[in-house]
């Protein structure tokens, strides 16, 4: 029957089954497409809502940004007005004072140059970390408010001697004084240059040195040689400079000297004429005497307090060692005391004359030995004065060399006898 083209119903049914299957798959595919479209629509809806949400957040952030910018412009205007106000306050003439101690974040205790202490307000723009006791500050002239912090050495006359300011005196320029040279170099110069020697031996180098002796014996000149031979910072101050009009200024100056020395360590402090502030303490009856004793106490405290590792050495010179306070002379403060004798032996006089004459133009017949062998009491300053006077006499006579007659006349002029000394006793 297949050959005749006749298909039976069973065979027809068999042939129709793939069509049914194709329709079912098509229907399923259509349903899947609908589901996919529905899911895609849901995704697009979620993205749309997220977009709207982000747009609202963006608008909110934009408003916040505009508000912050307005607030920033307002704060800048306020800051500018505040800076102008601070500048106006600091532009008027200010009073120099001293900061004593803080009370809280906004107030503190200061002392003015009049000697009075005040509880004052502290300008809010100042760095509280920089406010230390004994610092120099600027006070408002009307309210005494603390408006500025001055540099540490702004109102101090103490300064470190620069390299170009150091004296050109060397040890070779100091005639004689061989023992004094050795002692001061061991106590001052050697610890600064070769500190490891003292560490190996196990001893501490001397803290301070006292040079004492009559006037004109070479104390200051030897200190100049020390300053020239070392690279340490050199601070020179006279004892009378510590005495001020207002109470507290002298001790503060002592603290400033040692603070400056510690900041520039290794350093040497030279206090000349120390007897003006370091005399023996007594029951003072006047304010000035009590102030001098406060200066001495501060000096003793600083010499006890500064650390050995800072390499700060103290040299003091005086003509009256017998008047100094025993607390200053004890070991631990002034460990080495070097005496400068007024009477020089013949060898010392020869060295001094030779040192001074080496820089002068002497005639070949000039005989220094005739002056050296004399037994008059001659200090180094007197010998220098003799040679200077001889040079002046040669200049007076339009000569370029110094003759023996110039030396004799200068010697007679400078070396006074008992009769000529009475001429200077005006107040008898």
From Swiss-Prot:
One function term, GO molecular function aspect: ATP hydrolysis activity
Domain of life: Eukaryota
Modifications made to the protein after synthesis: N-acetylated by NAT3.
Keyword Heme annotated: no
Matching PROSITE patterns: AAA (PS00674)
InterPro entries: 26S_Proteasome_ATPase (IPR050221), AAA+_ATPase (IPR003593), ATPase_AAA_core (IPR003959), ATPase_AAA_CS (IPR003960), NA-bd_OB-fold (IPR012340), P-loop_NTPase (IPR027417), Prot_ATP_ID_OB_2nd (IPR032501)
Chain positions with N-acetylmethionine modification: 1
Keywords from the UniProt entry: Acetylation, ATP-binding, Cytoplasm, Isopeptide bond, Nucleotide-binding, Nucleus, Proteasome, Ubl conjugation
Single GO cellular component term: proteasome regulatory particle, base subcomplex
Gene Ontology biological process terms from the UniProt entry: positive regulation of RNA polymerase II transcription preinitiation complex assembly; proteasome regulatory particle assembly; proteasome-mediated ubiquitin-dependent protein catabolic process; ubiquitin-dependent protein catabolic process
Cross-link Glycyl lysine isopeptide (Lys-Gly) (interchain with G-Cter in ubiquitin) per UniProt, renumbered positions: 280
SMART domains per the UniProt record, alphabetical: AAA
Subcellular location per the Swiss-Prot or TrEMBL entry: Cytoplasm; Nucleus
Binding site for ATP: 213-220
Family recorded in the similarity comment: Belongs to the AAA ATPase family.
UniProt function note: The 26S proteasome is involved in the ATP-dependent degradation of ubiquitinated proteins. The regulatory (or ATPase) complex confers ATP dependency and substrate specificity to the 26S complex.
Protein name: 26S proteasome regulatory subunit 6B homolog
Organism: Saccharomyces cerevisiae (strain ATCC 204508 / S288c)
């Amino acid at each position: 029957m297949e050959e005749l083209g006749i298909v039976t119903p069973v065979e027809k049914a068999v042939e129709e089954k793939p069509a049914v299957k194709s329709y079912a798959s098509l229907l399923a595919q259509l349903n899947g497409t609908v589901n996919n479209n529905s899911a895609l629509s849901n995704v697009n809806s979620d993205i749309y809502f997220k977009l709207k949400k982000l747009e609202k957040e963006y608008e909110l952030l934009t408003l916040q940004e505009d508000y912050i910018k307005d607030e920033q412009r307002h704060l800048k205007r306020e800051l500018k007005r505040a800076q102008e106000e601070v500048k106006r306050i600091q532009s008027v003439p200010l009073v120099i004072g001293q900061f004593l101690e803080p009370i809280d974040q906004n107030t503190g205790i200061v002392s003015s140059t009049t000697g009075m202490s005040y509880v004052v307000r502290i300008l809010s723009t100042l760095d509280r970390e920089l406010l230390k006791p004994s610092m120099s500050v600027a006070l408002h002239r009307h309210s005494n408010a603390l408006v500025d912090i001055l540099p540490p050495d702004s109102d101090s006359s103490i300064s470190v001697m620069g390299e170009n300011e150091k004296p050109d005196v060397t040890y070779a320029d100091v005639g004689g004084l061989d023992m004094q040279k050795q002692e001061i170099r061991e106590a001052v110069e050697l610890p600064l240059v070769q500190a490891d020697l003292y560490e190996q031996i196990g001893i501490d180098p001397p803290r301070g040195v006292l040079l004492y002796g009559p006037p004109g014996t070479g104390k200051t000149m030897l200190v100049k040689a020390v300053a020239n031979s070392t690279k340490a910072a050199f601070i020179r101050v006279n004892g009378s400079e510590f005495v001020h009009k207002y109470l507290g200024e002298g001790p503060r100056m002592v603290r400033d000297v040692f603070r400056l020395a510690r900041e520039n360590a290794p350093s040497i402090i030279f206090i000349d004429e120390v007897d003006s502030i370091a005399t023996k303490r007594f029951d003072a009856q006047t304010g000035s005497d009590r102030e001098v004793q406060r200066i001495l106490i501060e000096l003793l405290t600083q010499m006890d307090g500064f650390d050995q590792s800072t390499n700060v050495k103290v040299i003091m010179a005086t003509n009256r060692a017998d008047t100094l306070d025993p607390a200053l002379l004890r070991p631990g403060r002034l460990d080495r005391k070097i005496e400068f004798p007024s009477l020089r032996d013949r060898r010392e006089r020869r060295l001094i004359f030779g040192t001074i004459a080496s820089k002068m133009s002497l005639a070949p017949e000039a005989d220094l030995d005739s002056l050296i062998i004399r037994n008059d009491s001659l200090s180094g300053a007197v010998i220098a004065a003799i040679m200077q006077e001889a040079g002046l006499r040669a200049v007076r006579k339009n000569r370029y060399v110094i003759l023996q007659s110039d030396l004799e006349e200068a010697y007679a002029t400078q070396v006074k006898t008992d009769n000529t000394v009475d001429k200077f006793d005006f107040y008898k």
